[in-house]
């Protein structure tokens, strides 16, 4: 089932409008959100300037649908488009970008007696933003995104049990560069789908729908099934979200429409005209999708407007999956948080 949550931090009128690409996770039984970006004043279609946020908020998690938020600190700088990984010790925030530059910073946020602590971890050897990541055992993997400002298919790994070793470059994911892919760990393997890349010197724009599974033992990628809807149409999860679900499954939601967004990347759709259509025109993915690793098959849980987001973040805890903010169409955010509840056997 899917239910709307109530309550969003009100301390900053810009942030209150909802953001994309925030840092988020579960920390000591609380949902933590931080950073993110939006166009709070003038819409992007009218040349508005993107604002980035710095505040960190927490709200206790319960079965209740109401959040009570409190500000608990600030990020080192206003940022968005990084990766947040929940660990036993706290939340690890990796990379991202500010209004002016991409980041290589990595740090651990932890709660000690209601006080937020920040511990510096080894920095990435490159700057990374708009990437994805997941934890397999004590290996933290970060894949795709912009690496030193260029769309990439690179992957880096940090062994959390041996921080002195720093980040290591792992096997690139096959195919085109993948900005804003979806990455989920399940049963000791890493799964990645989707992603796109604007044109850069020597490379034309691309959009990927395919997926791969990475085995840490062999350090090799193998192809897995492309997501598709009930009619059999392939779905782009680029800009979407994914999380482990139920008994060994993976839940994916959101993402841009593969045909429309590729035309935007190619410049066929551009400027104010492209940005001024109604929400429905952009056809963000409405399907809640379940991937079954054992059979390499996809099923759909149905179509939900609440899942049709790009740049939303999904956070999971005890059979609840929170879809946080994101955009309804390019430049237009929502401050909604919706919760998917697993059916318990």
Features from the language model and the residues they span:
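Kelch-like beta-propeller repeat domains
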Residues: 1-345
């Amino acid at each position: 089932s899917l239910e709307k949550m109530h309550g969003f931090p009100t301390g900053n009128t810009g942030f209150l409008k909802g953001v994309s690409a925030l840092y988020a996770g579960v920390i000591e039984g609380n949902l933590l959100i931080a950073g993110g970006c939006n166009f709070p004043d003038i819409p992007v279609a009218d040349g508005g300037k993107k604002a980035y946020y710095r505040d960190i908020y927490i709200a206790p998690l319960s079965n209740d649908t109401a959040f009570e938020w409190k500000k608990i600190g600030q990020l080192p700088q206003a940022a968005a488009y990084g990766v947040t990984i929940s660990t036993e010790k706290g939340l690890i925030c990796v990379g991202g970008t500010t209004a002016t530059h991409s980041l290589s910073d990595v740090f651990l946020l932890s709660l000690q007696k209601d006080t937020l602590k920040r511990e510096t971890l080894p920095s990435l050897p490159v700057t990374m933003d708009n990437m994805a990541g997941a934890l397999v055992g004590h290996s933290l993997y970060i894949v795709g995104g912009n690496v030193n400002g260029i769309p990439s298919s690179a992957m880096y790994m940090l062994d959390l049990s041996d921080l002195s070793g720093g980040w290591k470059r792992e096997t690139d994911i096959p195919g085109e560069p993948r900005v804003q892919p979806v990455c989920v760990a399940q049963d000791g393997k890493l799964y990645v789908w989707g992603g796109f890349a604007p044109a850069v010197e020597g490379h034309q724009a691309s959009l990927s729908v395919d997926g791969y599974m990475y085995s840490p033992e062999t350090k090799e990628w193998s192809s897995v099934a492309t997501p598709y809807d009930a009619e059999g149409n392939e779905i782009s999860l680029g800009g979407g979200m994914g999380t482990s679900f139920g008994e060994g499954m993976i839940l994916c939601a959101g993402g841009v429409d593969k045909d429309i967004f590729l035309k935007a990347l190619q410049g066929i759709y551009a400027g104010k005209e492209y940005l001024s259509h109604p929400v429905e025109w952009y056809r963000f993915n409405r399907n809640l999708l379940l991937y079954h690793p054992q059979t390499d098959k996809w099923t759909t849980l149905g179509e939900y407007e609440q899942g049709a987001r790009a740049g939303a973040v999904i956070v999971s805890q005890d059979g609840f999956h929170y879809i946080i903010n994101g955009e309804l169409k390019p430049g237009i955010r929502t401050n909604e948080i919706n919760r998917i509840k697993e059916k318990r056997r």
